[in-house]
């Protein structure tokens, strides 16, 4: 996410969207703000045409960059037990984090919650990449905490769960 737009462009986009700069990387929130501002800035609705053009350019560039980051990578392979285990339905709460705080502190190869699966995927992808994984390129809980500078607490987990819940399964790269 940090390579999608340069610093000046990202600040300008967040200002145009009317969002706090700390929300950079929260794609669902940015999308809602973009759609709202499109109505406000649209020239046919009496809005500012220049702001509309600039916002469209920056948002499109950000969106294209995120799509590029979401291209499938063909890193490590999954064995049959992992594929079968991930298809089980453990329930809504256990789906995100089966055991707090154990899953948040240490990866468990036997756990099938999203927190552990995304951390395992992070570790596998890290082996095949030169540059570090960052939020939106990787949706694991650790990348989320590092990107937004958040502590390891249940409140942070709830924020992460909310964003993961609004993210398509394909984008999670599981």
Swiss-Prot record:
The keyword Transcription regulation applies. GO terms for biological process: symbiont-mediated suppression of host gene expression. Signal peptide: none annotated. One of its GO terms (molecular function) is zinc ion binding. SMART domains: DnaJ. It is found in: Host cytoplasm; Host nucleus. The modification N-acetylmethionine is found at residue 1. Disulfide bonds: none annotated. Residues 12-75 form the J domain. SUPFAM superfamilies: Chaperone J-domain (SSF46565), T-antigen specific domain-like (SSF161240). Its main location: host cell. InterPro entries: DnaJ_domain, J_dom_sf, Papo_T_antigen, Papo_T_antigensf. A zinc finger (C4-type) spans 103-116. Keywords: Acetylation, Activator, Early protein, Eukaryotic host gene expression shutoff by virus, Eukaryotic host translation shutoff by virus, Host cytoplasm, Host gene expression shutoff by virus, Host nucleus, Host-virus interaction, Metal-binding, Oncogene, Phosphoprotein, Transcription, Transcription regulation, Zinc, Zinc-finger. A zinc finger (H1C3-type) spans 122-143. Gene3D superfamilies: DnaJ domain (1.10.287.110), Small t-antigen, unique domain (1.20.120.1860). The keyword Transcription regulation applies. One of its GO terms (cellular component) is host cell nucleus. The common region of SV40 ST, 17kT and LT proteins comprises the J domain. This domain is essential for multiple viral activities, including virion assembly, viral DNA replication, transformation and transcriptional activation. This domain is also required for cyclin A-transactivating activity of ST. Promotes efficient viral genome replication by accelerating both G1 and S phase progression of the cell cycle. Inhibits host PP2A by binding to the A subunit, thereby displacing lower affinity regulatory B subunit. Inactivation of PP2A in turn results in the transactivation of cyclin A and cyclin D1 promoters. Late during the infection cycle, ST may induce dephosphorylation of host eIF4E-binding protein EIF4EBP1 leading to the inhibition of cap-dependent translation. May establish and maintain high levels of viral genomes during persistent infection in cell culture. Interacts with host PPP2R1A; the interaction inhibits PP2A activity. This is Small t antigen.
């Amino acid at each position: 996410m940090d390579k999608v737009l340069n610093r000046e462009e990202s600040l300008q986009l967040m200002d145009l969207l009317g969002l706090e700069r700390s929300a950079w990387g929260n794609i669902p929130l940015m999308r809602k703000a973009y759609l709202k501002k499109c109505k406000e800035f649209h020239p046919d609705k009496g809005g500012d045409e220049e702001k509309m053009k600039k916002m469209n350019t920056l948002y499109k560039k950000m969106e294209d960059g995120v799509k590029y980051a979401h291209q499938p990578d063909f890193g490590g392979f999954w064995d049959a037990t992992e594929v079968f285990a991930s298809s089980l339905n453990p329930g809504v709460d256990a789906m995100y984090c089966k055991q707090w705080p154990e899953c948040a502190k240490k990866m468990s190869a036997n756990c099938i919650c999203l927190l552990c699966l995304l951390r395992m995927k992070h570790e596998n992808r890290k082996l095949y990449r030169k540059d570090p994984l960052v939020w939106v390129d990787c949706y694991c809980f650790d990348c989320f905490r590092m990107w937004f500078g958040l502590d390891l607490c249940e409140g942070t987990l709830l924020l992460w769960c909310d964003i993961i819940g609004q993210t398509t399964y394909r984008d999670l790269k599981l």
